[in-house]
């Protein structure tokens, strides 16, 4: 796992992400790139996969229209998807990739997808977080 962890750290630094926290033993990074809307993105290096999770908002009052809109938007997301956490109240962006052949382009594509999603869908996200 040390090799994968080091590779991921190299990708993050090469893409100018700010590493807030890292724990090699647990395989966890917490990163941000606020100019792209990414804050407290959790990246888990868990051989054989890497997991990206970005908290988006909390659903205060579950609403059919919110869930419908999120599922419809999932179809447009290039990499990753909206998911709910175990409580069913927190909306998270999540993506997973295989570590074995992970390259910088794949890694960056997930981060670009998240950034694009946050910029294109920000008005909806803000509105949903008010419910």
In which residue ranges do the predicted regions lie?
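Charge-rich, low-complexity N-terminal segments
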Residues: 1-38, 76, 83-85
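Beta-strand-connecting loop/turn residues
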Residues: 25-27, 48, 89
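Long, continuous compositionally biased terminal/linker segments
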Residues: 34-58
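Short, internal acidic amphipathic alpha-helical interface segments
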Residues: 51-90, 96
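A short, solvent-exposed beta-edge/loop patch
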Residues: 83-113
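Long, contiguous binding/interaction regions
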Residues: 116
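C-terminal partner/receptor-binding element of secreted or periplasmic proteins
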Residues: 119-125
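Short, highly charged C-terminal tails/helix-capping segments
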Residues: 126-131
């Amino acid at each position: 796992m040390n090799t994968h962890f080091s590779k991921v750290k190299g990708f993050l630094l090469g893409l100018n992400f700010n590493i807030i926290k890292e724990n090699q033993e647990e395989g966890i990074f917490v990163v941000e790139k606020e100019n792209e809307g990414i804050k407290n993105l959790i990246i888990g290096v868990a051989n054989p996969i890497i997991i990206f999770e970005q908290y988006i908002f909390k659903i205060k009052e579950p609403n059919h229209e919110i869930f419908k809109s999120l599922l419809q938007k999932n179809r447009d997301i290039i990499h990753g998807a909206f998911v709910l956490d175990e409580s069913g109240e927190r909306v998270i962006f999540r993506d997973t990739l295989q570590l074995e052949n992970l390259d910088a382009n794949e890694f960056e594509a997930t981060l670009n997808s998240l950034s694009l999603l946050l910029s294109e869908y920000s008005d909806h996200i803000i509105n949903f977080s008010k419910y």
